[in-house]
Amino acid sequence: MSIVRMTDLDLSGKRVLIRQDLNVPIDNGQITSEQRITASVPTIKLALEKGAAVMVTSHLGRPKEGSWTEEDSLAPVATRLAALLGVDVPLVRDWVDGVKVAPGQVVLLENCRMNVGEGKDDQTLARKYAALCDVFVMDAFGTAHRAQASTHGVIRFAPVAAGGPLLMAELDALAKALDNPAKPLLAIVAGSKVSTKLELLSNLVDKVDQLIVGGGIANTFIAAAGHHVGKSLNEPDLIPTANQIVADAKTRGAEIPLPTDVVVAKQFLPDAEASVKALDAVDADDLILDIGPQTAQRYAELIASAGTVVWNGPVGVFEFESFSHGTETLARAIASSKAFSIAGGGDTLAAVDKYDIAKDVTYISTGGGAFLEFLEGKTLPAVAALQARGQ
């Protein structure tokens, strides 16, 4: 990958601007999950250890450009960052036209989405960002799919543009999973709708050996195979598409295994009575809310024999205890597997947390939309810009 890495650069005495993803949930001025802040600390520490004058910026929420509001301020983040780094981290409010910072110091530059032109990747703004630094470091994989002034434009104009450790770890893990995977490569793609993950399914079916589908997506594939799905969430208009994906898989010698048993209920409620049924016994008023134990065991065996596992989405309504067992079985199979495993997507990360398997998954992507777009085979604007500068 032709990207200059921050870890390879001499940063002594250099002004370094780092774009991090510090977009954390804040409730009444209190940070409710600091995972992204914690993740950014090693990169900032490394820049300080290398003798740089460090400027860090990030977006937070969706503020109106050109206006400052307290709820969109990075002030709580600056406080927490200072505690984690053990150094002062002043917050600089008006920073576009110049920042005072000395080698060995770090400042946090206020929410970059407050700057006029940030969202539209304005060239004038991007050039101003670039003028602040000797080296620009893109370390926010979660925003790498957005072409904005702080994630794309600045890369074109900075004297040197590099990928930070977090971004490079993410790209390295994804490349290992998709470009050069240990075989067999198994992907789990689940979600409510085929339509939202159509590009993902179409791209993965060209790469994988097995593709496990779950949730509402699986219901559409079940219906496409000629089975009744009752009142379950599915997309009848996408049955031809599902059939095409199955045909494409067959042509490649890949497999899309379907459930043989499912867990159903009459109502979509946490305390609805759950029944395990064979796939061909689903009634007209049934809702399929999870895979059955027999299917979960079969999928777990496929995971156990995989060389690489890519996991995006829980296979049932895992928030409801009665319909969580399929997702739990697969999560535990991934945790105990020797395969290279990568998990990503909001609901997937919630399942990883629920079953406490983070330490047993090789790589957990915090990229969200960027992770999905990478899996879809799309070029991420920030990555493309870094590659162009690395030539």
From Swiss-Prot:
Quick one: which pathway?
Carbohydrate degradation; glycolysis; pyruvate from D-glyceraldehyde 3-phosphate: step 2/5
Report a single Gene Ontology molecular function: ADP binding
Q: What's in the GO CC field?
A: cytosol
* Catalytic activity of the protein: (2R)-3-phosphoglycerate + ATP = (2R)-3-phospho-glyceroyl phosphate + ADP
Q: Chief location of this protein?
A: cytoplasm
Concerning InterPro entries, the annotation shows: Phosphoglycerate_kinase, Phosphoglycerate_kinase_CS, Phosphoglycerate_kinase_N, Phosphoglycerate_kinase_sf
**Pfam families reported in the protein's UniProt record:** PGK (PF00162)
Q: Where in the cell is it found?
A: Cytoplasm
Q: Where does substrate bind?
A: 21-23, 36, 59-62, 113, 146
The record's annotation in Gene3D superfamilies points to: Phosphoglycerate kinase, N-terminal domain
Query: Which keywords does UniProt give here?
Result: ATP-binding, Cytoplasm, Glycolysis, Kinase, Nucleotide-binding, Transferase
Q: Quick one: which residues bind ATP?
A: 197, 319, 345-348
Tell whether Disulfide bond is among the UniProt keywords.
Answer: no
Its EC number(s): 2.7.2.3
Gene Ontology terms describing biological process: gluconeogenesis; glycolytic process
**Family of this protein:** Belongs to the phosphoglycerate kinase family.
The record, for HAMAP family, names: Phosphoglyc_kinase
Q: How does it assemble?
A: Monomer.
Report the protein name in the record: Phosphoglycerate kinase
Q: Which organism is it from?
A: Xanthomonas oryzae pv. oryzae (strain PXO99A)
The root-end lineage is: Bacteria, Pseudomonadati, Pseudomonadota, Gammaproteobacteria, Lysobacterales
